[in-house]
Amino acid sequence: MELWLTGTILKPKGLKGELKVQPVTDFPDRFLSRTKYFAGRQPETVVPVNVKSATLSQGFAWLFFEGVDSREKAQEMAGMHLYIEEKECAPRPQNRAWLHELEGMRVKGRDGVEVGVLTAILPMPAHEVYEVRTGNGTVLIPAIDEFIDEISLEGGYIVVPRFDEFL
């Protein structure tokens, strides 16, 4: 079973187990209709969770799960990721990439010279940030058109011509 990341649990809200979730999807409305997720800190350690109720507000999903009925139980889930099965995903729109397809891609700087590997995609309120591992450590690159010139799924690379500005 292949799992796809769809959200990150940020923190509990209130005393009854409600959870604030940062969607990591182009389709946040699907949080309103989905009844099951797989929750875990890594895809290898997930457990199924059933949704009791869901709302969307201010760019976040607010979820109640069966069996999570207190702030303490909700706090244990903070920092976990929510995954769905690949078969539940909508087809990828043309000229778009799923986030998990980008992880592991080579990152090229000016003149096509390889500078590192994309190791993680960090969800942030304004936009995602790419974590790139280089020979000298880790660099964070905002995932916006100003810095990302090209993403080639077929070639397995991302072009960041101004990479030197982040060193």
From Swiss-Prot:
Gene3D superfamilies reported in the protein's UniProt record: PRC-barrel domain, RimM
Domain of life: Bacteria
Keyword Chaperone in record: yes
Chief place of localization: cytoplasm
Keywords: Chaperone, Cytoplasm, Ribosome biogenesis, rRNA processing
GO biological process: ribosomal small subunit biogenesis; rRNA processing
Keyword rRNA processing on entry: yes
SUPFAM superfamilies: PRC-barrel domain, Translation proteins
Domain observations: The PRC barrel domain binds ribosomal protein uS19.
Function per UniProt: An accessory protein needed during the final step in the assembly of 30S ribosomal subunit, possibly for assembly of the head region. Essential for efficient processing of 16S rRNA. May be needed both before and after RbfA during the maturation of 16S rRNA. It has affinity for free ribosomal 30S subunits but not for 70S ribosomes.
Family the UniProt entry places it in: Belongs to the RimM family.
UniProt subunit comment: Binds ribosomal protein uS19.
The protein's name: Ribosome maturation factor RimM
Organism: Chlorobium phaeovibrioides (strain DSM 265 / 1930)
Gene name of this polypeptide: rimM
